[in-house]
């Protein structure tokens, strides 16, 4: 990219990498180097490029819009016999680095960053996953790799749908999931990264339910919601379960997150304090994405370009966060992203438990809660 922009051969380009905080997916795109390099070339001296907040927002590579449709079939005794999941979204790798995309069984390239999470560890009988590229998103907004990437929206759909399935079958949502986390067949896991398979996901789910007081009687308009995940990639799972406690104001539609309880099995924890910090940050990021963050694209530009209108989680909205790591001697796996993906569905499921309003869109705005309440009525 730089060689082409500067008209130089690649062997003349030297990149020096510095440890300067988190990029959270944005630094995987190298486009921001080009204007800095061109300015330096024009001035004949080193240049440090600093964007205004508005320019940074306009120049961003946001998380892709997505749409998902899921179906589930039940057999005798409420047993799940089939599940179908179709997801359409922008494919960030198709924009950033098309040559590295793997090929599917038919030899067609696909983007795992837009499909990870759909190939879950639940035993559901017949299973089909169909992932479609949203070409309009790819052409118009340059979709990026925002922290948690595909599982950030895939697991929102999967775990919200699991909750809906549990209620349709009239089964407790935790028990419903545990029934399918049986470690059968390909869900048994394998060495070195997924030893124990779905049984480890079941273990964190069981533990978080105990820790959060699942099944306790809640005050009016307060609910507990649960979600679980294996993190980013099936080939290197990080087992996470989250219970969210929320309070819903039926008049305003406002949702207040009161507590997040999270249990994680990430194999051997090498640096406990660093591990806890990663999970805290990931969980609060997930909460911000669940309840606050989002904008519209108007005439090809983001509508909200500064923090006066682009809403974020603020300190006053930070709930109690309780984290527990499962003692393990298994292979260490990633911790930067997995907890992000369990929070939003846990929040959505808690809203339903609190007031019966089922929300299916992120972020969860007060208006959407009021609409869901009205629809329920």
Predicted regions and their residues:
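Alpha-helical support elements that line or immediately flank enzyme active sites
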Residues: 1-43, 100-119, 145-194, 200-203, ...
């Amino acid at each position: 990219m730089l060689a082409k922009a500067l008209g130089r051969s690649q062997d003349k380009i030297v990149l020096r990498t510095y440890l300067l905080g988190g990029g959270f997916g944005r630094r995987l795109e190298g486009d921001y180097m080009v204007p800095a390099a061109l300015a330096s070339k024009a001035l004949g001296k080193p240049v440090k490029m600093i964007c205004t907040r508005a320019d940074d927002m306009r120049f961003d590579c946001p998380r892709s819009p997505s749409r998902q449709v899921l179906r589930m079939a039940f057999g005798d005794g409420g047993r799940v016999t089939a599940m179908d999941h179709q997801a359409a979204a922008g494919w960030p790798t198709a924009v950033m680095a098309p040559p590295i995309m793997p090929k599917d069984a038919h030899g067609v390239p696909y983007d795992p960053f837009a499909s990870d999470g759909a190939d879950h560890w639940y035993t559901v009988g017949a299973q089909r996953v169909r992932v479609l590229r949203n070409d309009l998103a790819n052409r118009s907004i340059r979709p990026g790799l925002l922290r948690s990437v595909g599982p950030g929206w895939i697991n929102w759909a999967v775990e919200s749908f699991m909750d809906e399935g549990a209620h349709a079958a009239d089964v407790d949502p935790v028990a419903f999931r545990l029934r399918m986390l049986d470690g059968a067949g390909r869900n048994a896991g394998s060495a070195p990264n997924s030893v124990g398979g779905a049984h480890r996901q079941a273990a964190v789910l069981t533990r978080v339910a105990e820790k959060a007081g699942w099944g306790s009687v809640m005050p009016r308009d307060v609910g507990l919601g649960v979600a679980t995940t294996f993190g980013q990639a099936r080939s290197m799972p990080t087992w996470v379960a989250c219970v969210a406690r929320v309070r819903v104001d039926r008049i305003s539609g406002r949702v207040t997150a009161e507590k997040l309880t999270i249990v994680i099995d990430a194999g051997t924890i090498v640096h406990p304090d660093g591990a806890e910090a990663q999970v805290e940050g990931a969980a609060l990021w997930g909460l911000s994405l669940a309840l606050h963050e989002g904008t519209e694209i108007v005439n090809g530009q983001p509508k909200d370009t500064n923090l006066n209108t682009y809403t974020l989680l603020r300190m006053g909205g930070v709930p109690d966060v309780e984290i527990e790591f499962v003692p393990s001697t298994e292979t260490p796996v990633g911790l930067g992203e997995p907890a992000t993906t369990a929070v939003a569905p846990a929040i959505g499921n808690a809203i339903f438990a609190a007031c019966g309003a089922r929300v299916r869109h992120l972020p969860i705005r007060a208006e959407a809660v009021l609409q869901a309440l009205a629809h329920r009525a």
